[in-house]
Every structure is written in structure tokens, then in C-alpha cells.
């Protein structure tokens, strides 16, 4: 039995397969999952697990160089955005932050390696992580 790192076998595989510029989406419980994209559904209840909890665990193993957020976060969930940026910088170091309209974010999610659905119930609490390099 694996005893350290990401214990969810599906997420562990997605993270292990991530290369430079590959993308992984971590989304709220209402996000529409595109057909044909690998989905890992972690939701057990509203808010559980939360977005930050999942991001923190992912960043223990995944190097990120850029994140993509919906512009609507600035109006609907600015506190979540600020917490997310603080957590990512703490765990990963500085990253480029790209914001796009939510409609474009949904289109971009059609091309990710996987989507992890959290229990987050805060509007627009979705992020696309873009893989970096460790050298």
C-alpha cells in the first residue's frame, strides 16, 4: 500500500503523467465536465473537500508555472482568489496568472489531461494548473 504522497490512484497517475505545459483543472462542484475528459470526482458533500485542500496536496507533487482563472472570480469570489494565489506562491513559488472569461475557461477545460471535481461551492472557484519544469 502506498503510504506517502497522493493516495488517490487516479489523481496520482494524472500528476505522474504531467509534463511541461500539460494542464490539469481543479473545479467546483457545479462545473460542467466536458465529454471525453478524464474526471476524478472527489465530492462527498458541499464544501468537502475544499478547493484549497486539494490544491495544497497537488502542489506537493506538481510543479506549476502558470495558472488560469475565470475573470469572474474578481467579482464573485475575490477572497478565494487571494487565498488561492497566496497558497500557490507559498507551495510552488511565483507563477504567471492568466485570467479569461468563464466561457473561455470552460472551452479550455476540454483539452486538459484531467479534471478534479472538488466540493467547493464558491462561485467560479476553478483553476487550470499548467505544468512547469523542475530544472
Swiss-Prot record:
The entry's keywords: Carbohydrate metabolism, Cytoplasm, Isomerase
Enzyme Commission number(s): 5.4.99.62
Reactions listed under catalytic activity:
beta-D-ribopyranose = beta-D-ribofuranose
Pathway listed: Carbohydrate metabolism; D-ribose degradation; D-ribose 5-phosphate from beta-D-ribopyranose: step 1/2
Care to name a GO molecular-function term for this sequence?
Answer: intramolecular lyase activity
Q: What is its main location?
A: cytoplasm
Q: Would the keyword Cytoplasm be found if you checked this record's keyword annotation?
A: yes
List where in the cell it is found: Cytoplasm
A Pfam family (short name) is: RbsD_FucU
Gene Ontology biological process terms from the UniProt entry: D-ribose catabolic process; fucose metabolic process; fucosylation
Q: Where is the active site?
A: 20
Q: What does this protein do?
A: Catalyzes the interconversion of beta-pyran and beta-furan forms of D-ribose.
Q: Name the family.
A: Belongs to the RbsD / FucU family. RbsD subfamily.
Protein name, per record: D-ribose pyranase
Its source organism is: Thermotoga maritima (strain ATCC 43589 / DSM 3109 / JCM 10099 / NBRC 100826 / MSB8)
Organism lineage string: Bacteria, Thermotogati, Thermotogota, Thermotogae, Thermotogales
Q: Which gene encodes it?
A: rbsD
Amino acid at each position: 500500500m502506498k503510504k506517502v504522497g497522493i493516495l488517490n490512484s487516479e489523481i496520482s497517475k494524472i500528476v505522474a503523467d504531467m509534463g511541461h505545459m500539460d494542464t490539469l483543472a481543479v473545479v467546483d462542484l457545479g462545473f460542467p465536465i466536458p465529454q471525453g475528459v478524464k474526471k476524478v470526482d472527489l465530492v462527498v458533500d458541499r464544501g468537502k473537500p475544499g478547493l484549497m485542500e486539494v490544491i495544497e496536496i497537488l502542489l506537493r507533487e506538481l510543479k506549476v508555472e502558470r495558472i488560469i482563472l475565470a475573470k469572474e472570480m474578481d467579482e464573485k469570489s475575490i477572497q478565494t482568489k487571494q487565498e488561492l494565489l497566496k497558497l500557490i506562491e507559498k507551495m510552488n513559488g511565483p507563477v504567471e496568472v492568466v485570467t479569461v472569461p468563464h466561457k473561455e475557461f470552460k472551452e479550455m477545460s476540454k483539452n486538459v489531461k484531467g479534471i478534479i471535481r472538488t466540493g467547493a461551492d464558491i462561485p467560479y472557484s476553478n483553476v487550470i494548473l499548467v505544468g512547469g519544469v523542475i530544472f
